[in-house]
Swiss-Prot record:
Name this polypeptide is given: Glutamate 5-kinase
Database matches in SMART domains: PUA (SM00359)
Pathway(s) annotated for this protein in UniProt: Amino-acid biosynthesis; L-proline biosynthesis; L-glutamate 5-semialdehyde from L-glutamate: step 1/2
Binding annotation for substrate: S49, D136, N148
Pfam families: AA_kinase, PUA
Reactions catalysed: L-glutamate + ATP = L-glutamyl 5-phosphate + ADP
Protein task: Catalyzes the transfer of a phosphate group to glutamate to form L-glutamate 5-phosphate.
Cellular component per GO, a single term: cytosol
HAMAP family reported in the protein's UniProt record: ProB
The PUA domain, residue ranges: 276-354
Family: Belongs to the glutamate 5-kinase family.
Amino acid sequence: MAQTLVVKIGTSSLAGGKEGNLALATIAQLVEVLCHCQRRGDRVVLVSSGAVGVGAMRLGLTERPQQLAQKQAVAAVGQGHLMRMYDDLFAVLRQPIAQILVTRQNFVDRQSYLNIYNTFQALFELGVIPIVNENDTVAVDELKFGDNDTLSALVASLVEADWLFLLTDVDRLYSADPRIDKTAVPIERVVSLAELAQTIQVGSAGSPWGTGGMATKIRAAEIATEAGVRTVITDGRSPTNLLKILGGEALGTHFEPRPKTINARKRWIARALIPKGELWLDEGAVKAITVGGKSLLAAGITRVEGEFQAQDAVKLCDPTGAEIARGLVNYNSEEIRRVQGQQSTELANILGYAGADTIVHRDNLVVTL
């Protein structure tokens, strides 16, 4: 049965060592694996890092640039060379590819988000393998994915993938970094991310040439599994592992997808949008939303954090400040401060106009517990 596969390869797997040289043998093997999957009927997306690393190599830089403008310039140099390499390798196997460069703003804007979806579908119909990367040259700090693990998870959610493979420089997730801690225990299967968080130690940074560590991969797994995508962390230096895993072998760390998934629009609200503020709720409102599936009313709001406009995304928090949901607000932050704790029947009198009865309607609300 044909499946949709999203494969993310990081800079640590693309590079052959600390000097940042490309691991061409590994990349060529990955290309062969992806072409094999494509030819048997699977739909394949490759999310590839490496523009900054390749650009730095071409420019003779010995360290990854730190300033945004310099990173963007180096990425502009590297992205073309990266795609040329992929095009040369895929062309040997007569497999057409496409470059898709996106920014976080493309995922935040609903129309742009849908346009990206339609582009993927058209490429799949044409038998093309899309190669995705963040458009580093035009991205701004406030609207960056930050790492391609997150980008790959959002892409997997967007195209409703069956599998997300996060290729890294270790064979699976461990209780601690096995390169440092010899007592680290391998983790083969994850059902509860909450339980996992209590048992492992993860770093916030990856290799010198990458931006993502294991923590970002776990966050990516959360996004993907919430969308019903089985996620696997495995060794990027052995691309044939993908075929073995698809064949049923127990390699890597498998994150089980959630059995009940939300619809595509709510996935967009929950994970693609960037919350502009927070609404703190009383216990009654928390229960009504998480158990009863109700809309958020003004009466249940105890605190408003941040400045935002109507239809912006916000976090909904319990009395301790822990996030319980996300949603699109019907009023701006100033208006909500004026009506918080009030009955819905009083909103028009307080605001001076008749608006929505709800602060966040349940159709625009997603529980994230």
